[in-house]
Amino acid sequence: MELWFTEYQTPTLGITCKTKKTLHSEKTEYQELAVIETEQFGRMLLLDGIIQTTVADEFVYHEMIAHVPLFTHKNPKKALVVGGGDGGSIREIVKHPSIEKAVLCEIDRRVIEVSKEYLPEISCALDNEKVEVVVGDGIKYVKEHKNEFDVIIIDSTDPIGPAEGLFAIDFYRAVYDCLKEDGIFVAQTESPFIDKELITRIIRDVKSLFPITRLYTCAIPTYPTGYWCFTMGSKKYDPLETDIDSIPDIDTKYYCPQIHRAAFILPKFAKELIK
């Protein structure tokens, strides 16, 4: 008998994958957590039935959420990831020689533990000597740390449940205060095809706090519509002015200097969202 998994991404849209088996399933303190083996995308991490990452396409998301702000900043030494318990963003951050410390703040301990067990290629840097893992509320952590980080990455789930507060202007204010005077933050901000109002609001909120606000995009097959965006708020450095010729060669599959520049070139319909 064939087994198929379907994520209903909207009331009228979904993605369906043929599965081999369920490797893990549990109800944590915060959410339903599962890892399944799929034919097309390999192992897939699910939270409340929503695809978070897969071994086949995770590199796109993690490289773009991490390297764009890190190479925009002139000398990032300390970075924070809020969410991202699978460890993919941390893996990319520690590829940068300038990084002296990377902090992961994940509210659900079991996401970290299960990722280490079933997704070692993604979570492989969580035990790196430069990495500190904090199990706790990311909003609380950010509010308790002022003027501390060069780069903050909001690697959150969708804006429902435990992650809802990570999309609020009060949180963005706390992020601003948590950053150093030349700091940069990036948040994943969903699909411009189906989350237009959310993106417009986030851009407006971030613009009210940061002198430089940019939207950039990439293609992620397993995320809703396959077209995803990130919002950057920067106190000093403009990613459009990054000297891409000076970006060193690092081990990536998607990100490159040309992609760094091209990701900010938006189709007309997406430009309308950020006016």
UniProtKB/Swiss-Prot annotation:
Enzyme Commission number(s) of this protein: 2.5.1.16
**Keywords, sorted A to Z:** Cytoplasm, Polyamine biosynthesis, Spermidine biosynthesis, Transferase
PROSITE patterns assigned to the protein according to its UniProt record, in alphabetical order: PABS_1, PABS_2
**Major place of localization?**
cytoplasm
What are the residue boundaries of the PABS domain, all occurrences included? 2-235
Instruction: Specify the pathway.
Output: Amine and polyamine biosynthesis; spermidine biosynthesis; spermidine from putrescine: step 1/1
Reaction equation(s) it catalyzes:
S-adenosyl 3-(methylsulfanyl)propylamine + putrescine = S-methyl-5'-thioadenosine + spermidine + H(+)
Which leading EC class covers this enzyme? Answer: transferase
Residues that coordinate or bind spermidine:
H62, D86, D155, S156, T157, D158
Q: Which GO terms describe its cellular component?
A: cytosol
What GO annotations for molecular function exist for this entry? spermidine synthase activity
Binding of S-methyl-5'-thioadenosine occurs at: Q31, E106, D137, G138, P162
Location of the active site:
D155 (proton acceptor)
Protein's GO biological process:
spermidine biosynthetic process
Q: Where in the cell is it found?
A: Cytoplasm
Please describe what this protein does: Catalyzes the irreversible transfer of a propylamine group from the amino donor S-adenosylmethioninamine (decarboxy-AdoMet) to putrescine (1,4-diaminobutane) to yield spermidine.
Q: Which PANTHER family match?
A: SPERMIDINE SYNTHASE (PTHR11558:SF11), SPERMIDINE/SPERMINE SYNTHASE (PTHR11558)
Assembly information from the UniProt record: Homodimer or homotetramer.
Q: Which family does it belong to?
A: Belongs to the spermidine/spermine synthase family.
Q: What is the recorded name of this protein?
A: Polyamine aminopropyltransferase
Organism, per UniProt?
Acetivibrio thermocellus (strain ATCC 27405 / DSM 1237 / JCM 9322 / NBRC 103400 / NCIMB 10682 / NRRL B-4536 / VPI 7372) (Clostridium thermocellum)
Q: What is the lineage of its organism?
A: Bacteria, Bacillati, Bacillota, Clostridia, Eubacteriales
